[in-house]
């Protein structure tokens, strides 16, 4: 699963996801993509599950680009532990996704295969997404 090799600080504030994606909202590598429609935190397990679903359906043909990286540590306290006594330990890594952010891109397959592969991948994610295609010039 994806996670940073090292970070400046071990833990982070929860924060809020405001506004729309400034960068990373257009197709940069592939012919087809999966774009987020709502703000949410997507964890590393979801990203990996989506990647597996996409590559499995494509039968190793074509190429997949993951355009998001889980760089936010999410902490949790153990069950049945009283409040206080400091912040919990890092449970998993997540990525803050804004609306309009390109999450996955694929190339080297037909539109039907791309559409179905990204639909299967989207089912694994906790954000609403839509299929996008590069406009032929």
UniProtKB/Swiss-Prot annotation:
One of its GO terms (molecular function) is structural constituent of ribosome. GO terms for cellular component: cytosolic large ribosomal subunit. GO terms for biological process: translation. The keyword rRNA-binding applies. Keywords: Ribonucleoprotein, Ribosomal protein, RNA-binding, rRNA-binding, tRNA-binding. The keyword Amino-acid biosynthesis does not apply. SUPFAM superfamilies: Ribosomal protein L16p/L10e (SSF54686). Gene3D superfamilies: Ribosomal protein L10e/L16. It comes from the Bacteria. Binds 23S rRNA and is also seen to make contacts with the A and possibly P site tRNAs. HAMAP family: Ribosomal_uL16 (MF_01342). Belongs to the universal ribosomal protein uL16 family. Part of the 50S ribosomal subunit. This is Large ribosomal subunit protein uL16. The gene is rplP.
């Amino acid at each position: 699963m994806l996670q940073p090799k090292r970070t400046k600080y071990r833990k982070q504030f929860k924060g809020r996801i405001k506004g729309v994606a400034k960068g990373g909202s257009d197709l940069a590598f592939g012919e087809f993509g999966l774009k987020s429609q709502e703000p949410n935190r997507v964890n590393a397990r979801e990203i990996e599950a989506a990647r597996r679903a996409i590559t499995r359906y494509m039968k190793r043909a074509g190429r997949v680009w993951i355009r998001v990286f889980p760089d936010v540590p999410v902490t949790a306290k153990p069950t049945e532990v009283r409040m206080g006594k400091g912040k919990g330990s890092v449970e998993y890594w997540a990525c803050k996704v804004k609306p309009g952010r390109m999450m996955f891109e694929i190339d080297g397959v037909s539109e039907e295969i791309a559409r179905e592969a990204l639909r299967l991948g989207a089912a694994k994610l906790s954000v609403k997404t839509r299929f996008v295609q590069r406009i032929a010039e």
